[in-house]
Swiss-Prot record:
Enzyme class (EC, first level): transferase
Top-rank taxon: Bacteria
UniProt name for this protein: Aspartokinase
Gene Ontology MF terms: aspartate kinase activity; ATP binding
Catalysed reaction equations from the record: L-aspartate + ATP = 4-phospho-L-aspartate + ADP
Statement: the UniProt record of this protein carries the keyword Nucleotide-binding: yes
One GO cellular component term: cytosol
UniProt KW keywords: Amino-acid biosynthesis, ATP-binding, Diaminopimelate biosynthesis, Kinase, Lysine biosynthesis, Nucleotide-binding, Transferase
InterPro entries to which the protein is assigned, alphabetical: AceGlu_kinase-like_sf, Asp/Glu/Uridylate_kinase, Asp_kinase, AsparK_Bifunc_asparK/hSer_DH, Aspartate_kinase_CS
Any single GO BP term: diaminopimelate biosynthetic process
Family classification: Belongs to the aspartokinase family.
Gene: lysC
E.C. designation(s): 2.7.2.4
Length: 431
């Protein structure tokens, strides 16, 4: 499952892993113990939420958030016993406090400050351990297009930039997650949860032997342990299985992060920053499993979904044209259920602009229902799974729509039944 030990190890620490002075101390202990070649860090837990709120507020009402963010980071620095200058970041926020309209380019600069701050604190504290650690600026490595708030990495540019870096083998490089830059140096961000994506891109660039994701749970569970009790740790998943979980609501990993690891065949290990047993879940290309029949490995719940249906106005309409139209408007279809006369697909309910309806009317009659919940059952060889067991477990709970493939069964249900249905199915399948 692992590459040669001489290949680089990439470690990524999420927001809860760097949320307090105590947790940052733990992060530095792990870095000292594991000696990864590259470390990618998220913003301090909750700070990106504050920065998003900063961007939403009108001018004249943002100063309180600047002070809140300042107090949080200066308090952490004081508790860590380090002296570090963060003044440049407060100057940026203060500059934008009274700007009338924050454009997407401005918002990207603001949102990136969370990772700029956390990486500065962690780098400074790690140096007290006398570690051979240097800062690697994400804006020089994660090169993207100019979609400032949902930037798409340009792998060709990144590979060129990577080859020009004078990296030293005996040095640990610490980099901000979530953010990057255009070829002209303007700051971009990869979207919420994008630090996972940053780490996987680094894993691809350096041909890592392993990407280790440190979070607040010890791996991937049979359901979200923050929603259900008595969930079980999953030892291993394939990339395909994890992709299904991530795209249907599992928050443990960002769904875009898997593609670089698939391309470069970099295995992922998800574990907890705070669990000394070092339990976790391996995610890799294939597993040495001998299951003969279908098996359910995990459930995921995604709330606040919109179910769209396009009834084709011509037999010449193609599925890829409909989905391409949706993507061209900046939306990512979730579950897609194609029929001969039309197609169902889901997107987040908040993303319900009239522009989608108008654009899709070129292909046929358009309808939308929501908000709804999506419950996904993920596993292997599920195309032959008998749905009777699922419907028996749900009793009289109405299922509005469902689909079944070899790796996932998707159920679209009323939004009020999401947690209850997930719990019912989990009890039925795993107890």
């Amino acid at each position: 499952m692992l590459r040669q030990e001489t290949a680089p190890l990439v470690c990524k620490f999420g927001g809860t892993s760097v949320g307090t002075a105590q947790s940052i101390r733990r992060v530095c202990e792990i870095i000292q113990e594991e000696r990864p070649s590259f470390v990618v860090v998220s913003a301090v837990a909750g700070v990106t939420d504050w920065l998003e709120e900063f961007c939403r507020l009108p001018k004249g009402k943002r100063a309180a958030l600047t002070e809140k963010i300042r107090e949080r980071h200066e308090s952490i620095a004081k508790e860590l016993g380090i002296e570090v200058s963060l003044a440049i970041f407060w100057e940026i926020l203060e500059h934008f406090e009274d700007v009338e309209e924050l454009f997407s380019e401005d918002q990207a600069r603001i949102l990136a400050i969370g990772e700029d701050l956390s990486s500065t604190l962690i780098c400074s504290y790690c140096c007290t351990y006398v570690l051979p650690l240097k800062r690697l600026e994400a804006r020089q490595v994660i090169l993207t297009d100019s979609q400032f708030l949902r930037a798409v990495p340009d792998l060709a540019l990144m590979q060129t930039a990577w080859g020009e870096l004078a990296l030293q083998e005996d040095t640990i490089y610490l980099m901000q997650g979530f953010l990057g830059a255009t070829s002209s140096g303007k700051t971009t961000v990869l979207g919420r949860g994008g630090s996972d994506f940053s780490a996987s891109l680094i894993g691809e660039l350096c041909k890592a032997r392993e990407l280790r994701i440190y979070t607040d749970v010890c791996g991937v569970h049979t359901a979200d342990p923050k929603i259900l009790k008595d969930t079980q740790l999953i030892d291993s998943l394939t990339f395909e299985e994890m992709q299904e979980l991530a795209s249907s609501g599992a928050k443990v990993l960002h769904q875009d992060m898997l593609k670089p690891c698939v391309r470069a065949k970099v295995p992922i290990f998800v574990t907890s920053t705070f669990n000394v047993t070092k339990e976790g879940t391996w995610i890799c290309a294939s597993l040495n499993e001998s299951t003969e029949g279908p098996v359910i490995k995990a459930l995921s719940l995604k709330s606040n979904q919109a179910l769209w249906f396009v009834e084709y106005n011509s037999p010449l309409v193609r599925l890829e044209d409909v989905l391409g139209c949706v993507r061209s408007l900046g939306f990512v279809p979730g579950v897609v259920m194609a029929q001969s006369l039309g197609v169902y697909f889901t997107i987040d309910w908040e993303e319900y602009p009239q522009t989608i309806t108008k654009a899709l009317e070129a292909f046929g009659t358009v309808s939308c229902e929501g908000p709804l919940s999506l419950v996904a059952l993920v596993g292997a060889k599920l195309a032959s799974w008998s749905m009777s067991r699922v419907f028996e477990a749900l009793h009289r709970t109405p299922v509005l729509c469902w689909s079944q493939t070899d790796t996932v069964i998707n159920l679209i249900i009323n939004k009020d039944f999401g947690v209850a249905v997930t719990e019912l199915l989990h009890d039925c399948l795993f107890k």
